[in-house]
Amino acid sequence: MNISMRYFSILVVVSFSIFSFKYGFWSEASEASDSKIDTRAVSVLKGTITHVRDGDTFEINGIPVRISALDCAENSTPEGKKITRFTKKFQGKQAVCELTGAKTYDRVVGYCSIAGKDFAQTMMNETSCKLWAKYDVWDRY
């Protein structure tokens, strides 16, 4: 390979690399989201509680929401099962969640209310769920 062909090859590789980065061929932002909508652009999520996973996670119109600042026993424990049964009373109800912008696993994180009442506060008052102050990012409790 002569020198001019070598320089031409290097020029092509460098040009392609710059073009690829500039136009996002290798960008992580282009990966598909697991949710039905891009929740990063949503500050308030309103809808019906369509599924209850446990005491601190439910789905609104199929979008999983982790309740901010709330710590409930896991479903694998007797107390967790009791809390989940209590939480299922809210299935089918309308909820309004202010999303914090955080995401954990497949869930968006938010402070939610049902019928104008703070859901986390209700859970702390009515069940053995506790405040998880580390995740009370807006200092609500």
PLM features per residue range, with description:
Residues N2-Y141:
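Small beta-barrel nucleic-acid-binding modules, primarily SNase/OB-fold domains
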